[in-house]
Amino acid sequence: MRGAWLSRRAMVKAVLAAIGAFSVSWRRRALAAPVEITLPDRVPAETFTFEAKGIEGWTTVDGQWAVEEMAGAPSGKKVLVQRATKNEFNVIVAPPGPYTDVDVSMKFRPISGREDASGGIVFRFTDGKYYVVRANALEGNFRFYHYDRGRRQLASAGVKPPALGQWHSVRVVALGDHVQAWLDGMLYLDHRDTRFKSGRAGLWTKADSITAFDDLTIRGVGIGG
């Protein structure tokens, strides 16, 4: 009888310990969740839907970029498509800026690619140096890089690969050295880096990625602003 009572007592202790461990684990996860950073509401936005205007005034660093009509475009009938397949990276930079702090978002549709099927946001682009956040339909990761005559990964998060042929969204907010990035509305990357201070924003693909882009929105604080 005493043995049975001790057994029940041990079981109760085990259950309470498990509940306590779960509670501590949950609190740790809650505390670890990053606070989302934002630009002040007064910072204006410029959105590119490629309907009334093309890419006049944009800077093509590399790639074959053109505005095309596409069924199912998020806004209207036209999108910006990158079709070069033999470059290491393909970059186009929008006219606004340069900016220090930015909030940049876009929609992208990975159309095809055997080596890569990616879409990304370039920011703080100056003299060929930049940051980029990208998603790849062929890989289960969402990554943040800096580029300066080569690439170096700064941060990575495991994600469900964005589906080929479907529209997805990417957003980046950079305040000082603090960078956060979202894929399809979920915050995955939270990182700090002091390398690049300011520059313009744009779009990015890699290798043989054929990718469509739409609804590029840039909010930025100018140098000295």
Where are these regions (language model features)?
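Extracellular carbohydrate-recognition regions
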Residues: 34-61, 225
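Short, aromatic/His-centered strand-loop micro-motif at the edge of beta-sheets
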Residues: 149-169
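N-terminal secretory signal peptides
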Residues: 1-10, 14-24, 31
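Secretory/extracellular carbohydrate-interaction modules
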Residues: 84-143
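Extracellular glycan-recognition surfaces and repeat-rich motifs
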Residues: 53-79, 85-88
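Ligand-recognition surfaces built from glycine- and aromatic
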Residues: 198-225
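Short tryptophan-centered beta-strand motifs in secreted/extracellular beta-sheet-rich domains
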Residues: 106, 167-175, 179-181
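Short, solvent-exposed beta-strand-to-loop segments that form ligand-recognition rims
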Residues: 184-200
